[in-house]
Amino acid sequence: MSRTYYYMRISTAEERGKQKFTRQEKSIQDYCKNQNIEYDEHDVFKDDCSGKTFDRPSWKSLKSRLQAGDTVVFKDISRFTRVDTKEAYEAYMDLMKQGIRLVFIDNPIVSTDYIQELVGTAKKSNIITETAMESTVKLLLIVELNRVEEERKNISKRIKDGIAASEKKTGECRKGK
């Protein structure tokens, strides 16, 4: 029997200190309500670490349980990963080929159901060749995965720039009020 799992990830000190997983939980619970899916806390996996690697404890635990027909729901694709685009694409395609459905609430055009629907429509109507469709799908995924990778780099740069700007010339941190 197929199961639906929910994956959440936070990585910044601000997220840890303030909102935690609240925003993602609400989004996923709303999705479940709208889709008439039972939300079960036992099917929720949470990581409190960077998405720049797939070496995350809860992700590895979830991945080891996945079987063909299962679904993993994420708030958005950046919660899946922020690794380099090639590695992210390969991980996505590997899961899809295993029959795992990936749902990205805020990025529905890269959810596996939509991707498979695109391919199916193209095949049925003979609009474009299968090879061209595969290239189109690859491009669509790569654009979105590259966006989240670049977003990670920008966040990292802003954090480093902020730290550098807050330090005195002696290298000491300024004291807040």
Language-model features: where?
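Short beta-strand segments enriched in small/hydrophobic residues
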Residues: S2-R16
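Short, structured active-site "lid" loops
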Residues: K60-D76
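Short beta-strand elements in bilobed, periplasmic/extracellular small-molecule ligand-binding domains
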Residues: Q29-C49
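Anion (oxyanion) recognition and catalysis
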Residues: K33, L66, M96-K97
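Phosphate/pyrophosphate-binding and catalytic-coupling "lid/hinge/switch" segments at subdomain interfaces
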Residues: E14-E15, M93-K177
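Acidic, metal-coordinating catalytic cores used for nucleic-acid/nucleotide bond scission
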Residues: T12-K20, K46-W59, D76-Y89, P108-Y114
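Short, surface-exposed alpha-helical segments at coil->helix boundaries
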Residues: F21-Q29
